[in-house]
């Protein structure tokens, strides 16, 4: 089957688009994105879609950027594909946000794509991820430690994002580029082994192909099966949470402790997100929450984003962690006998002689205290 027919069948099977949709292609000028844009432009009449393109200049390779921009503009002009071009400062963004270059470049690129899609009325954004990208992602997740979600690799679709080339091999894409005389630019950073992904691509994958020439296809298929299993288990976890939830972010700890691990460990991140947490939880954090289901009423553990998980009698509760008053800062001040001072979230009063503490008070007896008495934050 030709790449064109394979992509058409794949898009139809996964219902990536609907007739009348406008699709924005992420066009970098590299081979994958050029093949993607060419394919979608050719398939547009059969899919009933309109195709537009967007080209983002990251500012990381100023010597290559003009050539890539010219290629994208010429390619789109010849085919009457509307194109939006924008330039960003990735290094400045990374400095400001405190993130790595790859992470910063990706954040800027996707923010640009989504902004353009909104402005142009494009319901879908197509990216050029292919089978090798998916295999690299699965292997990368395995090396770092992952569950079934990570084994699923790159999703076929993700909200407004679609990946029509995800089952296409790199060889099939290169053949398509050659047969259709499609020009493209090569990114020299793809050859630099300073990046972990490139080491996987240039060192690990050739060894796997030597074991089985279809290794990439088999790994990708295994990822698809893992993704389907994950979707089913996620639905089981969501139903369990619905049945045993006591409040947003709270669940019956005893019921959760008796649940199958495969369900319980998917409920835990759901509780975390209900409490305002973002992203995923590491295995360490899940194990910490799981241990709370087995412990007494006073146990707690800290989670990312200022969230706390706590065992409250028969409940496992996730909530925003309260600020510790001892960590607050304030200006030092002098205490005078009988005059209350409110600082750092406390009311402090200096007395002579004995003083019994009320239900919301603490009394401390300091022998040989010398005046003046100063109240200050902890050092």
Where do the PLM segments sit?
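A generic structural signal for alpha->beta connector loops
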Residues: 48-50, 80-82, 148, 158, ...
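Short, composition-biased local secondary-structure segments
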Residues: 29-47, 140-152, 360-375
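Flexible helical/loop "lid" subdomain adjacent to adenine-nucleotide binding pockets
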Residues: 124, 130-294
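Secondary-structure boundary/capping residues
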Residues: 16-20, 49, 81, 114, ...
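Generic detection of intrinsically disordered/low-complexity segments and helix-coil linkers/edges
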Residues: 104, 123, 178, 189, ...
């Amino acid at each position: 089957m030709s790449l064109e027919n394979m992509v058409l069948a794949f898009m139809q099977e996964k219902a990536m688009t609907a007739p009348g949709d406008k699709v924005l292609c992420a066009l970098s000028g590299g081979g994958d994105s050029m093949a993607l844009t060419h394919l979608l432009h050719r398939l547009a009449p059969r899919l009933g879609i309109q195709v537009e393109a967007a080209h983002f200049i990251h500012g990381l390779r100023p010597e290559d950027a003009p050539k890539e921009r010219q290629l994208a503009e010429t390619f789109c002009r010849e085919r009457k594909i509307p194109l939006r071009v924008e330039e960003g400062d990735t290094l400045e963004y990374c400095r400001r946000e405190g993130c790595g270059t790859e992470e910063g470049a990706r954040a800027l690129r996707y923010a640009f794509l989504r902004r353009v899609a909104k402005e142009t009325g494009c319901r879908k954004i197509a990216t050029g991820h292919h089978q090798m990208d998916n295999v690299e992602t699965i292997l990368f997740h395995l090396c770092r430690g992952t569950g079934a979600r990570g084994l699923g690799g790159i999703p076929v679709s993700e909200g407004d994002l679609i990946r029509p080339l995800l089952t296409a091999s790199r060889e099939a894409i290169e053949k398509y580029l050659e047969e259709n005389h499609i020009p493209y630019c090569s990114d020299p950073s793809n050859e630099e082994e300073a990046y972990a992904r490139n080491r996987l691509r240039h060192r690990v994958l050739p060894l796997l192909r030597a074991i089985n020439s279809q290794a990439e296809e088999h790994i990708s298929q295994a990822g698809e099966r893992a993704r389907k299993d994950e979707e089913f288990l996620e639905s089981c976890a969501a139903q369990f949470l619905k049945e045993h939830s006591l409040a947003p972010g709270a669940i019956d700890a005893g019921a959760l402790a008796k649940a199958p691990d495969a369900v319980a460990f998917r409920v835990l991140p759901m509780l975390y997100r209900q409490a305002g947490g973002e992203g995923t939880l590491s295995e360490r954090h899940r194990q910490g929450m799981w241990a709370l289901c087995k412990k007494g009423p006073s146990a707690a553990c800290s989670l990312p984003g200022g969230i706390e998980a706590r065992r409250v009698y028969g409940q496992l509760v996730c909530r925003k962690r309260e600020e510790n008053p001892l960590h607050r800062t304030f200006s030092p001040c002098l205490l005078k006998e009988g005059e209350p001072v409110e600082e750092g979230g406390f009311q402090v009063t200096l007395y002579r002689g004995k003083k019994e503490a009320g239900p919301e008070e603490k009394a401390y007896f300091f022998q040989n205290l010398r005046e003046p008495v100063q109240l200050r934050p902890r050092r």
